Amino acid sequence: MRADCFPSSDSPGPTVLAGEVLRRLRRPPIAGGPQALTDFFDRLLQARRRVLMLDYDGTLAPFEHDRMRAQPYQGTRELLLRIHTQPGTRLVVVSGRPAREAADLLALAPRPETWGVHGWERLTPSGQLVRAILPQQAKVAMTRVLALKPQLEGAGARVEQKYASIAIHTRGLSAQQAAQVRALIAEFDPPADGPPRPEGIYLQSFDGGFELRALGPNKGSVVRGVLREEPRETLIAYLGDDVTDEDAFAALGGRGLAVRVLPPAGAETPPRRSIAHVALRAPEELLQFLQRWADLPFGAVPPP
């Protein structure tokens, strides 16, 4: 694979992108709701190139205490396969998991393009895995995090080492246990008047824990890379549930629809602000969206 297929060197770092997201949050809310979906699907039917990008955990599959049991919602695979095989449509999965792990859990054949570790890994449909180069500073910082593994696991957390990050899972822990875990990794997110943060890595919360991530690619840089590879008129939708997906929403610009996927009724998470155009409740509204896309007669679009 060509080096320029990997959006790493020219992608803004998380500090810059976070500022971009905050600026967008201060603007008037983006018009959304049912009409936004209607307008999008009207445009989608006329588009000659389409890209559907989706997160995995919390979007295509519910969260599970045992992460390897997180299977897609019933009916999701069949709809994604129909979309994946549509003419002029590109299906892309973007996950915080390792790319092969996400692809294996989704278990689509033929396999779609899959990005893992928030954009550090790219798994092509042919099975080729490409990774961005991990800076030495990040490697050193991750070693410091791994030195805390016995204490973190002693507090009840589950520590997962990935290529460019270390996830610390706290799902199912009490508030006291979660606070103890957070205190153990406080040095990686010091206050403004505290000691300097270790170079090459930063701390980000997610739904179910914390992640120490190397500075570099993120889901927003994946979107920008896909946009560069596609014709200008390509229409894109990105579906995601977590704060890490806000980077992707921001990167869409005016080229597509940002969809926040909400958890099933009864599995609510703390409210937070989002720059998504619309929100869909999993699994019912998610499946309706995929069904609507899968049912469009793209083969009927006349040639220019």
What is each stretch, according to the model?
Residues 71-161:
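Active-site phosphate-binding/coordination module
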Residues 50-52, 112, 236:
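The start of beta-strands in P-loop NTPase/AAA+ ATPase cores
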Residues 45-66, 93, 223:
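Asp-based phosphoryl-transfer active-site loop
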Residues 160-239, 243-252, 256:
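Conserved acidic, metal-coordinating active-site core of Asp-based
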Residues 63-66, 125-129, 271-273:
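Short acidic, glycine/proline-rich loop/turn micro-motifs
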Residues 54-59, 118-119, 163, 169-171, ...:
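Short loop/turn segments at strand-loop or loop-helix junctions that form parts
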Residues 31-48, 101-108:
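Short amphipathic alpha-helices and their capping/turn segments at secondary-structure boundaries
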Residues 4-9, 14-34, 47, 220-304:
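Mg2+-dependent phosphoryl-transfer enzymes with acidic/Ser/Thr/Gly-rich catalytic loops
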